[in-house]
């Protein structure tokens, strides 16, 4: 290692800036990292060399000594060794420590650098919390007008004692001694070398010196949580409302999960929903159906006037514009469809009976049904 030119190892000029050194080291470290070159001793040795070279050149004092005396200033100095020919120096670090320092992973590769090396993510960072589902039943009135509901549910939250770290106050997380912070370890199966999640740290890259006495190192505890949920007008059965970050807490810096509120609308005693339209049936007196008039009908937004034309038949459907459900996606509000059912009196007073008999006598043939299509079609059955 002492005979190598440190600048050449990193591929930079002698006057390279600190940022240029760091950029060059990142590129070389990714190229020669042992995890990217399993079983390749030459790559592993080169990884150690470039790590040692970078550690020397990034330190102004060590770099000055190297520029003056060359590699001889550090003869015998390697990963974990003393400074050798340089007086007053401290020891060198493990090459993996240098790697973690540069890539800022607090004890392991993860996120962007691992994706850069292998095209995917892995352990060494926090674990995201799970998403949760809450089934919420509301009335049709609440679905039409919108509402605000308070819900209560149990979930994993960050431990109050350790603030989610899993470590007892005064203790801390340290680099996992098994995987050296990588979150994975290499295993050999005959001629095949493969990686697997570190059994010591579970892929976190760190372990806890002294677990928290409340959460026992989990970093999370189960608690009952209350949350106010705003329900927008127009929701329907199966509508999902997302409450970002209100799922279960992440572990070791991982993001919280989300909470999904799934809506269920109760059946209504009067209205039936058909998309954004509402349907209802109302009874009217046969005198109103015959003579016509105006009545008030209920809607989800109050009363509305409905004009009944003269001679309205039972089963006739009327449309009240914009009295249906609001559209969840915006746009025009639905309508309310009103089907009338003409009620025939089941009992009559003597006076009422006489009036109807007089009506039947003076009507003659005019009392026959005005719509004869059904009877014409039914003749062949008699």
From Swiss-Prot:
Chain positions recorded as Zn(2+) 2 binding sites: 176, 179, 198, 201
A GO biological process held by the record: response to heat
PROSITE patterns (alphabetical): DNAJ_1, DNAJ_2, ZF_CR
Name this polypeptide is given: Chaperone protein DnaJ
Principal subcellular localization: cytoplasm
Domain of life: Bacteria
Zinc finger boundaries on the chain: CR-type: 146-224
Domain remarks in the Swiss-Prot or TrEMBL record: The J domain is necessary and sufficient to stimulate DnaK ATPase activity. Zinc center 1 plays an important role in the autonomous, DnaK-independent chaperone activity of DnaJ. Zinc center 2 is essential for interaction with DnaK and for DnaJ activity.
Region (Disordered): 230-250
Keywords assigned: Chaperone, Cytoplasm, DNA replication, Metal-binding, Repeat, Stress response, Zinc, Zinc-finger
Organism name: Opitutus terrae (strain DSM 11246 / JCM 15787 / PB90-1)
Entry function: Participates actively in the response to hyperosmotic and heat shock by preventing the aggregation of stress-denatured proteins and by disaggregating proteins, also in an autonomous, DnaK-independent fashion. Unfolded proteins bind initially to DnaJ; upon interaction with the DnaJ-bound protein, DnaK hydrolyzes its bound ATP, resulting in the formation of a stable complex. GrpE releases ADP from DnaK; ATP binding to DnaK triggers the release of the substrate protein, thus completing the reaction cycle.
Cofactor(s) listed in the protein's UniProt record: Zn(2+)
Cited InterPro entries: DnaJ, DnaJ_C, DnaJ_domain, DnaJ_domain_CS, HSP40/DnaJ_pept-bd, HSP_DnaJ_Cys-rich_dom, HSP_DnaJ_Cys-rich_dom_sf, J_dom_sf
Binding-site residues, Zn(2+) 1: 159, 162, 212, 215
Annotated compartments: Cytoplasm
Domain J residues, every copy: 5-70
GO terms for MF: ATP binding; heat shock protein binding; unfolded protein binding; zinc ion binding
